[in-house]
């Protein structure tokens, strides 16, 4: 317990057990609950989350490759156009202006992204532009990727792709649940 989990998480598994409802000395106590069961559930939970996370990472990679492959078959797309349109939309959004811009700017200081950002004039008050799609896809979160995929699908009237947006949104929710217990 001390090395692999904490009491709060372990105790949360007890909610999977029924309680005695009849008045008496056991009322409100869990039926057949044993610490070993909680430990087993914790291990199973960990392994399932690990497996799901690996699958979700593969799905995210698939979506990036899918977008790039679709883009290659669109004559008017050069890898910059749709990203510029999307960043313009984000910058001027009435409800959540600069939401994506702010998310990207938070990453500017990150060692992982420095090579990408070194090429661009990064100013928090200026609109981002002229980032090629193959780099843009690497600096956005999975949720932002799905939002971009939806925009991309609508921009180029890719009806078959638009059908998948709902599924990818559910996968983002699953990813967040897996990552945050």
Give the location of each predicted region.
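Active-site-proximal binding-pocket segments
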Residues: 174-181
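Extended intrinsically disordered or low-complexity regions, especially N/C-terminal cytosolic tails and loops
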Residues: 1-172
């Amino acid at each position: 317990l001390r090395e692999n989990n904490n009491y709060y998480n372990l105790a949360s598994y007890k909610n999977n057990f029924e309680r005695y409802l009849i008045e008496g000395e056991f009322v409100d106590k869990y039926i057949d609950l044993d610490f070993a069961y909680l430990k087993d559930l914790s291990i199973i939970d960990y392994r399932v989350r690990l497996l799901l996370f690996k699958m979700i990472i593969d799905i995210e990679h698939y979506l990036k490759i899918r977008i790039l492959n679709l883009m290659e078959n669109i004559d008017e797309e050069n890898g910059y156009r749709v990203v510029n349109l999307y960043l313009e939309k984000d910058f001027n959004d009435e409800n959540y202006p600069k939401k994506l811009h702010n998310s990207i700017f938070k990453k500017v200081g990150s060692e992982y992204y420095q090579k990408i950002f070194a090429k661009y004039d990064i100013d928090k008050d200026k609109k981002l532009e002229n980032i090629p799609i193959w780099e843009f896809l690497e600096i956005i979160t999975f949720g932002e990727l799905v939002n971009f995929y939806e925009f991309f699908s609508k921009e180029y009237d890719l009806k078959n792709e638009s059908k998948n947006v709902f599924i990818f949104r559910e996968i983002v929710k699953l990813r967040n649940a897996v990552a945050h217990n």
